[in-house]
Amino acid sequence: MKRTIAIVAGGDSSELVVSLRSAQGLYSFIDKERYNLYIVEMEGHRWEVVLPDGSKTPIDRNDFSFMENGEKKQFDFAYITIHGTPGENGILQGYFDLLGIPYSS
């Protein structure tokens, strides 16, 4: 079974665009035959998953899940590419620790 990976990008700093580009680069390099990949865009209170058709759907912050085609999806891993807050100050890391979601940054 393929693991579902979040590439978390965006943030609240002026480097938001750089973070989104980094996420796109990672997305293009990771083997989609082995993993279900989704870019999660964060900016302020907007946390959204970019679906394969390009549409976006909100993240449920209670468990970092989302709905796709009527099915609840949960992430097995989060790759943090956010520059500045909340990716480089421990906020996201603490959130993922509380939820038990492994991550890398």
Predicted regions and their residues:
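ATP-binding N-terminal substructure of ATP-dependent carboxylate-amine bond-forming enzymes
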Residues: 1-105
